[in-house]
Amino acid sequence: MTVRGGATLGMVEGDEFRRDPRITITSVRNSHSDLSQLDTSPSAMEPNGNNKSASRSLLFRILYWIYERRLLRQIHKRSMPRHVGIILVGNRRHGLQRGLSNPREIYRCGAEKLDDILDWCAELSIRTVTLWVFSTENLKRSPAEISGILAAIEAKITALARDPSTHRRRIRVRAIGRLDILSESIVDAIRAAEAATASNNLMTLMIAVAYGGREEIVDAVRALLKAQSAEGASLPDVIESITPEAIARHLYAAELPDPDLIIRTSGEIRLSGFLLWQSVHSEFYFTDVFWPAFRKIDFLRAIRAYQARNRRFGR
């Protein structure tokens, strides 16, 4: 079962907000007496100096804030996913909309969204999040674009390892994929981040880079066969050893739970091989929002959709 979210963008998000008779100007005034968290400075509103536009912008911000709190109240009543995977798509289209042409600038915007995701997952006590930032198929793109993507990834991973909030929130950073095809500098950045956060144990951030689902399964089978060969197993024994459980033990991050929820941004309804083996019982959520524009309410709506599912695990 799939749910498509964010197809219509309105005052806050989709027709749901506009249809709800409980959300009125009066309810905005009365629902929360403390609006101190809102930034009401002129720079946070419309920059054209028009008082009417500024008032309208402030009203929208208040309505958005109220709607976000409503979503939080709804989802806190039910169980959270343990592991959320996100397929980050839409960087280029978002960049075109903003008039950006330099790949480094385009993908830097997407990389900065990572901080928000970590904040939101920490707030909801989600223990594992996997972000697919670069696929093996992305290697077919132009050298300039590949360089821009990998430069943004390397810079963000380096920043994560040095960020005090990473350690304050006890986030462990890991990377999965065919790292051997990456440059030495990005591999060094990955290994440094993994080493710096190895003792953190409240949240795991798994970064899928140079990753492909088919490649992961092939690599797992190869690792299994190599292990059997090293033990001197006969061919019949090797054949007998190939089971779903044995393959699963040789996946890139075998010790982590399978993803409960997989989110894909930008409106494309496919997995493209993301966590191909592990997603057999995952719930999927697709949103039209481009990755750099992905907001907290988009994330909360995905969590709410997940909570509404009846997960039977084949039963």
Where are these predicted regions, by residue range?
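Flexible, compositionally biased loop and terminal segments
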Residues: 2, 20-315
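Residue-identity detector for glycine
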Residues: 5-6, 10, 14, 49
